[in-house]
Structure formats: structure tokens, C-alpha cells
């Protein structure tokens, strides 16, 4: 039996075309591409602005059930579906997020897809790429430096150092940096205070970059950032410290979407990368809107399960950007359904139809949740070699009883040839006119009511609890004019509840909001639940231990 090639071996063997040829497929002139080598480029802001009057293509969201720690192949399916649509004669563009170094060297791996459904150059995309994350990290930390510098030179704004909310960021999983004391070492180093680091993908600057529509909107949003509070409890904004202009300068190039290609030489935008468990989990509005002007179909993803990424895609990204999705694909795997049915991780390779049927309740809820937004749904069964015919048949039967269709997809092994059936179904749904998109809640409800609606309607929680301090903070923000903002729930990706070990489709559980954060620049309020950390840690055996350069100088172990 021939050995199975690794993702990196497949990517390295790709017959890539020059990036100018990929741009030409979308009608992008050579002079409007800013090349980063031969196989990646940024699309100029000038070209993007010129597309404003064009008709939009169809928008397809790829989401998933609650995942296993390794993920269920959502990006792989997004890329595969884009290739599949092109294979059946549709002009399709893929839009995905950039990879964070934290997961690359941690547990989950990269974010370029897998098998024969990848975007390339895979190594570049998963590592430094075009420097967007560096720019975001730099802009965020410039503001942090200017806060402490302002205090050092007299604190004209009367910032209460006990109430500074702006932390520092870096693009790595490092639990040692979560909480620390800054400015130690004497008078010359400033005023000691408590601080810490978050991961770059949790930065409000990342969210702002992904929600801003142009450079002017970007600078306005950066100025709106609240960095902390004065002694009189009034908010201090980034523009009060005159930081917004310099931050925008650092982000000028990062605002331009990155164009790459799939293994089958189809265009893909890879831009922005907020996590979906601690941020809004979608690629940039700029990339998505540009792709909609250039392609007949745009296939995009939202992070983790539909309870997180899809809800935020609908309630934050689509609401803010005026997007209206035409269809949604929910990625399910036999192994994740079995895990949701109670099977232990080490036993997922063994057939267990009974556990799978039990775990299908998780899939059923995700289907119902997406339909709640008025978007038609198809289920993609991302095939693994350990799947049995009986297990696949059980999933198809369950989904058919919901009035939907589950389609087996082999894009990981076969590329676009393995996902044609799904591509045809997506076209059927998108062209049917069934989509009647609407957000889950209205702008005028109170912030706490919005949290309760997400918790009850999407998570099926029985109650939402929060300390008086949390409720008072929400009320204060409403009084300051932030009451119309949407909610961004920070929650475990492994369960509908706030307990990562509570699998399946739990009912009546309690959602406790332990902290709320106002992202005034991004335009949402973050409600933090459970044990979610905005700076992750590495696992006991991180994937970094297995990544190295071989004798030829090639990277091994990246996935």
C-alpha cells in the first residue's frame, strides 16, 4: 500500500502558477497587484475602490459542528468547495483567515487546508506570510507603549492606572505572559502596574482590521478604541493619546487583502485571522467584499462550530458589513459525531453506530441554528479513512429526517473531483432564492438581553448569570451610547455549554458571564464565559517539538 503523503509534501509538489496569472482570472491587472515573491500578492486599495458599483456574487458560508481538538476540516472543505465550484464551471473565489503561529506550534496546526484541498504557498501562509500579523501586533503594542509613556510624562489625561484595559499582544501561545507587573526597576522605568499579554488574534486591532471597510474607516475605528478610564471613570480613547494616526500608518499595507492560489490554481484571498472562541472568527470584510465583486461564488469560513463562528459571522460581520449569505455548509465528521456521542478520543477509529447516532443531536442543533438565521443548509461529511459505510449511512439518514441533505466529500484525498456533488448542491441552494437572512436579535435590545438571546436560542441554556459588577458595567456602556452594539461571546468551542466536556446537545445549562469587555473600535461587546483565556498556553507535547528543517533546508512537520 503506497504511503500517504503529508500536507506539506503535497503542498511542496504543487504546480503553482505565477500570482499575476491567478489575478488575471479575476480581472486584476498586473499593476494593481503588489507581489510578495512569485506566488502571493496584495490587491491594491485603488483597485478595490474601483469595484464598488459591481454586482455581488453568491456568498456561501462554511461552518461546522462542535469540533475535536484537531479540527474537522472546515478550511479544507472551504478550499475544496471553491475548487469544486470552479470544476463545475462556476467562477468561485475562496476567502479564509490567516494562520496564527500559536496554534501552528501548539495543537491545531496551520490554517491552509489539508490533503489535496490546500492553499499555497502553505509554509509561508502558516508562518510569516505577508507580515500582516506583525503589523497588527506592532500597531497594538505601539498604543500600549504610548499609554505608559503618557503616564510617565505627567499623565495629562488623568488615566487611572488601576483601570487600564489595554494589554499587550504577541502571536504565540505563552501562558507565562498572561499576568505580570510592568515598569519595575526604578523611577526611570515608569509607574509599576499590573498588565499582561493576549495572543494577537484576540487583539481588538485584529478585529478592527477585519471589520473596517477602508483606510478612513480603519483610522476612525482605531481612534475609538478605549484603553482605560480616568479617575472620574470617563473613558480614554486612543485618539486622546494621538495614537490613531500612527497605528493606521502601521496597518496601511496590512489592510490590503492577500491573494494566493489553491493546489488547483484557483484564486483564494487569505486575510485577517481573529479566533472564533475569543473574537469574531471571520476573515476580513475587505477580502470578502472584494471577492464578491470579482467572483460568481465566494466561499468563506467562520471559525470552530456554528455556535461560535457562524453566529458571529451572521450577527457581527454580516450585520456590520451588509452581507447576505445565500447558503451554508455545515461540516461534520464521523469521528466528531462519535465524540459528541461519548466515545473517547483513542477509540474514535472503531465503528460505533450507536454512539454516532447519539452524537448526531449535536449536528441537528447546528442545522436548526443556521436555519434560524434564514439561510438554507447542506451538510458535508468530511471523509476520513476510518469511516465505515454504516456510519456514513447513519449520518445521511439522520440529516434527511431534518429535511436537509448530507453529502459525502472526499476532497482531502481527491481534490475537486471528490466534492463535485456538494458543489452542485450548493449552487442549487444558492440559486433557489430560499435565503431570507436576518440576524438573531435587533440592535435596540439591552446588551444583557442580547447575551440571553444567544445563550437561550443558540446554546439552549436555561439561564444566564452574571455578577452585579458585570451587569452594572453593561448598563454604564448603554448610558455612554454603546447599547446598540452586537455581542461577541467568548466561549469554549467544544460544547454548546461553557463546559468543554459537556458534549452532544445539552439543554438547560447555566451560562455564567464572568467578565465583559467593550471593543468600541471593532464595534462589539465581548462577553467572556467559562475558562476561556485570551492568551492560550501550549500543550504538554506541542507540535513545535516535531517541526524542523531537513538536510535540504526544507521545513518538516508543519501541518
UniProtKB/Swiss-Prot annotation:
GO biological process: tetrahydrofolate interconversion
Protein name in UniProt: Formate--tetrahydrofolate ligase
Reaction(s) catalysed by this chain's protein: (6S)-5,6,7,8-tetrahydrofolate + formate + ATP = (6R)-10-formyltetrahydrofolate + ADP + phosphate
Enzyme Commission (EC) number: 6.3.4.3
HAMAP family cross-referenced by the UniProt entry: FTHFS (MF_01543)
SUPFAM superfamilies: P-loop containing nucleoside triphosphate hydrolases
Pathway: One-carbon metabolism; tetrahydrofolate interconversion
Family per record: Belongs to the formate--tetrahydrofolate ligase family.
Pfam families for the chain: FTHFS
Alphabetical UniProt keywords: ATP-binding, Ligase, Nucleotide-binding, One-carbon metabolism
Spans through the membrane: none
Enzyme class: ligase
Residues the record lists as binding ATP: 68-75
NCBIfam families, per the entry: PRK13505.1 (NF010030)
Amino acid at each position: 500500500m503506497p504511503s500517504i503523503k503529508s500536507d506539506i509534501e503535497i503542498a511542496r509538489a504543487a504546480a503553482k502558477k505565477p500570482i499575476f496569472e491567478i489575478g488575471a482570472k479575476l480581472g486584476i491587472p498586473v499593476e494593481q497587484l503588489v507581489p510578495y515573491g512569485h506566488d502571493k500578492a496584495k490587491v491594491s486599495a485603488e483597485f478595490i475602490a474601483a469595484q464598488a458599483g459591481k454586482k455581488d456574487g453568491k456568498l456561501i458560508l462554511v461552518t461546522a459542528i462542535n469540533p475535536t481538538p484537531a479540527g474537522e476540516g472546515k478550511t479544507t472543505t472551504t478550499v475544496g468547495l471553491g475548487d469544486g465550484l470552479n470544476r463545475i464551471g462556476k467562477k468561485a473565489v475562496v476567502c479564509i483567515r490567516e494562520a496564527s503561529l500559536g496554534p501552528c506550534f501548539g495543537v491545531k496546526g496551520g490554517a491552509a487546508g489539508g490533503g489535496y484541498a490546500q492553499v499555497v504557498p502553505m509554509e509561508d501562509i502558516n508562518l510569516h506570510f505577508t507580515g500582516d500579523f506583525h503589523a497588527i501586533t506592532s500597531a497594538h503594542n505601539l498604543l500600549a507603549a504610548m499609554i505608559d509613556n503618557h503616564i510617565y510624562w505627567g499623565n495629562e489625561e488623568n488615566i487611572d492606572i488601576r483601570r487600564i484595559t489595554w494589554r499587550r499582544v504577541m502571536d504565540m501561545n505563552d501562558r507565562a505572559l498572561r499576568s505580570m507587573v510592568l515598569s519595575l526597576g526604578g523611577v526611570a522605568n515608569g509607574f509599576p502596574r499590573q498588565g499582561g499579554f493576549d495572543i494577537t488574534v484576540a487583539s481588538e486591532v485584529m478585529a478592527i482590521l477585519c471589520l473596517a471597510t477602508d483606510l478612513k474607516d480603519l483610522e476612525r475605528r482605531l481612534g475609538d478604541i478605549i484603553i482605560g478610564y480616568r479617575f472620574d471613570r470617563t473613558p480614554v480613547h486612543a485618539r486622546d493619546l494621538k495614537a490613531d494616526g500612527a497605528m493606521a500608518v502601521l496597518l496601511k499595507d496590512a489592510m490590503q487583502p492577500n491573494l494566493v492560489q489553491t493546489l488547483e490554481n484557483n484564486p483564494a484571498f487569505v486575510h485577517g485571522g481573529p479566533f472564533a472562541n475569543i473574537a469574531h472568527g471571520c476573515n476580513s470584510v475587505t477580502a470578502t467584499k472584494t471577492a464578491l465583486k470579482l467572483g460568481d461564488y465566494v466561499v468563506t469560513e467562520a471559525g470552530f462550530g456554528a455556535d461560535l463562528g457562524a453566529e458571529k459571522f451572521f450577527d457581527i460581520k454580516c450585520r456590520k458589513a451588509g452581507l447576505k449569505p445565500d447558503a451554508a455548509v455545515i461540516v461534520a465528521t464521523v469521528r466528531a459525531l462519535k465524540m459528541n456521542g461519548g466515545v473517547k478520543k483513542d477509540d474514535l477509529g472503531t465503528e460505533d453506530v450507536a454512539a454516532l447516532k447519539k452524537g448526531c443531536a449535536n449536528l441537528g442543533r447546528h442545522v436548526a441554528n443556521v436555519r434560524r438565521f434564514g439561510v438554507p443548509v447542506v451538510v458535508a461529511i468530511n471523509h476520513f479513512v476510518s469511516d465505515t459505510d454504516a456510519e456514513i449511512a447513519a449520518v445521511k439518514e439522520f440529516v434527511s429526517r431534518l429535511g436537509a441533505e448530507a453529502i459525502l466529500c472526499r476532497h482531502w484525498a481527491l481534490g475537486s473531483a471528490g466534492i463535485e456533488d456538494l458543489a452542485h448542491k450548493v449552487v442549487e441552494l444558492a440559486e433557489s432564492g430560499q435565503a431570507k437572512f436576518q440576524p438573531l436579535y435587533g440592535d435596540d435590545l439591552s446588551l444583557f438581553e442580547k447575551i440571553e438571546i444567544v445563550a437561550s436560542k443558540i446554546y439552549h441554556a436555561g439561564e444566564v448569570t452574571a455578577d452585579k459588577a458585570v451587569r452594572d458595567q453593561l448598563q454604564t456602556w448603554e448610558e455612554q451610547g454603546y447599547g446598540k452594539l452586537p455581542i461577541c461571546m467568548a466561549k469554549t468551542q467544544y460544547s454548546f455549554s461553557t463546559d468543554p466536556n459537556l458534549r452532544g446537545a445539552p439543554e438547560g445549562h447555566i451560562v455564567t458571564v464572568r467578565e465583559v469587555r467593550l471593543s468600541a473600535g471593532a464595534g462589539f461587546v465581548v462577553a467572556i464565559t467559562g475558562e476561556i483565556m485570551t492568551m492560550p498556553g501550549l500543550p504538554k507535547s506541542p507540535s513545535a517539538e516535531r517541526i524542523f528543517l531537513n538536510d535540504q533546508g526544507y521545513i518538516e512537520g508543519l501541518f
